[in-house]
Amino acid sequence: IGSNLLTHGKGYISFESKDEKTYLKDLYQENPVKILFPKKLSNEIITAAFVTTSGGIVGGDKLDIIVKTCKKSEVQLYQQAAEKVYKNHKKPSIINISLTSEEGSWLEWLPQETILFENSNYIKKNSLHVNTNGRLMVGEMLFLGRHAMGEINTKGTIREIWEIFFDERLIWLDNFYIDDMDYIVKHPAGLNGANAFA
């Protein structure tokens, strides 16, 4: 794929609280990232859905997602569909997620699964920032191919970096890396034949 076809999608969103109600403060989106707001009942917290309109990412593509809940705001965010990472051509597919929960705020990040296809080269960085009395709930699921279609990905590279900051101080760092996919998937001390993990 020519470099002119590669994408660098961006989505930035922040929320603030006024009179004990949460409001959208800032919104920026750059193709193929879109942010949608489903209808909600008056007593429900604000919900936003992130959409990747390209249907997936390939080698050299990059997505940056930044979410911030300001003091006392409450928000739930999710992905509209599974993220798909296809076979790569030398360059990795990169996703950067930055989530910030300020003092007294509540942020839920509930993505659907990321599906890694055969020979994918995937890098993801999750940076989580929580301030005093802030609350943050985060989920993550990786699928090695589509089990229902009889797929099991045994070739490719995964690198996931997790950073957790409390009051701007790094308290947790995890660097997860797999390059010998077939060995890790089959080994009893690895995934032991499982094609999904969270």
Regions found by a protein language model. Name each.
Residues 142, 146-198:
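A structural signal for small-residue-enriched, beta-sheet-centric alpha/beta enzyme cores
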